[in-house]
């Protein structure tokens, strides 16, 4: 734990978590509407559509947990929750990559939205690692 007079939380990281939370909520709703569009108007195999929607729900769970632990770890200046958030960044980036590259049909809007999600993941990972290094260096003092 950091001394009481020393604030080590990363403000840019917290801003990214906040923006990513709102962006992901919008992404999730748009992606559900896009799947509805694909299911109704495109010859989308039913099994693939069900799989993609189930994976989107799993992605929602991973992302909510990742953002929660990242925010709590940053604000409370704790390494463990921030480390959990770092570990969950990789499955989150893999899911964004799946929706960017491996779906049956990838619309241009989806490609743009998933690219933005990957940018958020990369930026947050970099800032989380720097914040973890800051927390660790203050433990030695």
UniProtKB/Swiss-Prot annotation:
Compartments in which it is found: Membrane; Cytoplasm, Cytoskeleton, Cilium basal body
Annotated keywords: Cell projection, Cilium biogenesis/degradation, Cytoplasm, Cytoskeleton, Membrane, Transmembrane, Transmembrane helix
This protein's record includes keyword Transmembrane helix: yes
One GO BP annotation of this record: cilium assembly
Primary site of residence: membrane
A Pfam entry, by short name: Transmemb_17
Keyword Hydrolase: no
Membrane-crossing residue ranges in chain numbering: 15-35, 49-69, 82-102, 115-135
Disulfide bonds listed in the record: none
Membrane topology per record: Multi-pass membrane protein
InterPro entries, sorted: Uncharacterised_TM-17
A GO term from the CC aspect: ciliary transition zone
Role description: Part of the tectonic-like complex which is required for tissue-specific ciliogenesis and may regulate ciliary membrane composition.
PANTHER family: GEO07735P1-RELATED-RELATED (PTHR13531), TRANSMEMBRANE PROTEIN 216 (PTHR13531:SF5)
Subunit structure: Part of the tectonic-like complex (also named B9 complex). Interacts with TMEM107.
Protein name: Transmembrane protein 216
Organism of this sequence: Mus musculus
Source lineage: Eukaryota, Metazoa, Chordata, Craniata, Vertebrata
Gene for this chain: Tmem216
């Amino acid at each position: 734990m950091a001394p009481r007079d020393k604030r080590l939380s990363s403000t840019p990281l917290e801003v990214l978590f906040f923006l990513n939370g709102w962006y992901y909520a919008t992404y999730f709703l748009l992606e559900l509407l896009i799947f509805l569009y694909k299911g109704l108007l495109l010859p989308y195999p039913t099994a693939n559509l069900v799989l993609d929607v189930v994976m989107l729900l799993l992605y929602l769970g991973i992302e909510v947990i990742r953002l929660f632990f990242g925010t709590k770890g940053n604000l409370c200046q704790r390494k463990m929750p921030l480390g959990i958030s770092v570990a969950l960044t990789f499955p989150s980036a893999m899911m964004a990559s799946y929706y960017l590259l491996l779906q049956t049909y990838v619309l241009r809007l989806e490609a743009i939205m998933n690219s933005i999600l990957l940018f958020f993941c990369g930026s947050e990972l970099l800032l989380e690692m720097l914040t973890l290094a800051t927390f660790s260096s203050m433990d030695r003092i």
